[in-house]
Regions:
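PP2C/PPM-type serine/threonine phosphatase catalytic domain
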Residues: 1-237
Length: 237
């Protein structure tokens, strides 16, 4: 079961988030990207990131070693090359967070401040770590997590796909017994909705699409200052 919902929010004119998934007999991949850049460049970057990763995985699925990592490197190169050739796309970039399943392998990938959470029963755990200026302040002990949530510069990220010719990519290996569901989202959701509220909504609504709708509705009710995207998948809730 897969639920997916992307909304422009209450303030922005353009939705620069993009989410998609493939459930193939060879592998499964679930992705959320949050683009940035002038004109429509953010929308181009997020769309290109997701589609490039999917294309690479489809064409190289027989590879076993570093398949997910290589697919994200490929996407980074695709975005960067276009940004160098097209003035309207110059400086564009995107976050990416995703979950890849192949056989007994479960991997989560992250660049930027989109998030992946694992859910088991009433427990929810953030798998990814934000690549953001505020997260660095939290890690240094300069501010608390609560202060970070309302910090005026919380949207400044320290890593993105496509802004440089190379990028540092986080890969997390997940124990298949650790989780029954995964929730991927852009910061438009995670900035407005606490993880404890996320798991409560996921468990309350038995339909994953309905749960996604309710999560987006809650983020919009709290201001909806950014685009909001959520992708929820796993077994029966």
């Amino acid at each position: 079961m897969v639920g997916i919902k992307s909304d422009v929010g209450n303030v922005r004119e353009l939705n620069e988030d993009y989410a998609a998934f493939i459930e193939d007999e060879r592998f499964k991949i679930y992705l959320v990207a949050d683009g940035m850049g002038g004109h429509n460049a953010g929308e181009i970057a997020s769309n290109l990131a997701v589609k490039s990763i999917m294309r690479y995985l489809m064409e190289h699925s027989e590879e076993n070693e570093d398949l997910l990592l290589n697919s994200v490197k490929y996407a980074n190169n695709e975005i960067y090359e276009i940004s160098q050739k097209n003035d309207k796309c110059k400086g564009m970039g995107t976050t990416i967070t995703g979950c890849f399943i192949k056989g007994d392998i479960i991997q989560v990938v992250n660049v930027g401040d989109s998030c992946c959470f694992s859910i088991k029963g009433n427990e929810i755990k953030k798998v990814t770590k934000d690549h953001s200026w505020v997260q660095e302040l939290i890690d240094a002990g300069a501010i608390t997590e609560e202060e970070g949530r309302v910090h005026p510069k919380k949207n400044i990220i320290t890593r993105a796909l496509g802004t440089n010719s190379s990028v540092k990519i986080d890969i997390f290996n997940i124990d298949k017994n650790e989780s029954t569901m995964f929730l991927l989202c852009s910061d438009g959701l995670s900035n407005e909705v606490q993880k404890e509220e996320m798991v409560e909504i996921v468990n309350r609504y038995k339909n994953v699409n309905e749960a996604c709708e309710k999560l987006v509705d809650l983020a919009k009710a709290r201001g909806g200052k950014d685009n909001i995207t959520v992708l929820l998948f796993g077994g029966e809730v």
